[in-house]
Structures are given as C-alpha cells and as structure tokens.
Amino acid sequence: MIHKLTSEERKTQLESLHHWTAVPGRDAIQRSLRFADFNEAFGFMTRVAIKAQEMNHHPEWFNVYNRVDVTLSTHDANGLTERDIKLAHFIDEVGKHAKAA
C-alpha cells in the first residue's frame, strides 16, 4: 500500500526539488517548463509518458506550444508519495535544458 509522505518526509524530499511548488488547496506539487518550441515540448512529454507508464504513475499536465505545466499527486493515497518525488526528479532530469516558465 502506498502511503502519503509525512510532514518530515515531505520537507526532506522537497528540499531537492528546486523548481517545484506546492499546489494551493491540494496535497500536490507543480512545475512549469518552457522549451524552444512545440516539438521539443512534445518530445519531453513523450519521454515523461514512457517513464510514467513504466512506473504506473501518471502526471496531470497541460501543454500549449512550448510550455508544459505538470502537477504531481498520488490519487490512490490522496496526496504526495515517494512516487511523485521519483517522477519529479525524472522530469527535472529530462527537462534540465528547459527554462522555468
């Protein structure tokens, strides 16, 4: 069973995620990324989609042209879990050439 992060776990885990912010009114984190163009943004989304499918953990996201907004929360746990942190680190790695939007 997946458990939500405790407040101490959340504090420790989120310290390493510099571009992520808490979502107001939800136990979730979000990040916006800006790429050179739509093709680069879509390529990023494809890489994340493949990883998300492998993890069986899917992000909420929104894309317009070169911008991708990502929200992470684990629905089964009704909040942030280790899965969200792992996927956020993967997103940071594959999106490292993007600008914070």
Swiss-Prot record:
It catalyses: (4aS,6R)-4a-hydroxy-L-erythro-5,6,7,8-tetrahydrobiopterin = (6R)-L-erythro-6,7-dihydrobiopterin + H2O. GO terms for molecular function: 4-alpha-hydroxytetrahydrobiopterin dehydratase activity. InterPro entries: PCD_sf (IPR036428), Pterin_deHydtase (IPR001533). SUPFAM superfamilies: PCD-like (SSF55248). It is an enzyme of class 4 (lyase). Pfam families: Pterin_4a (PF01329). Its EC number is 4.2.1.96. Gene3D superfamilies: Transcriptional coactivator/pterin dehydratase (3.30.1360.20). GO terms for biological process: tetrahydrobiopterin biosynthetic process. This is Putative pterin-4-alpha-carbinolamine dehydratase. It comes from Burkholderia mallei (strain ATCC 23344).
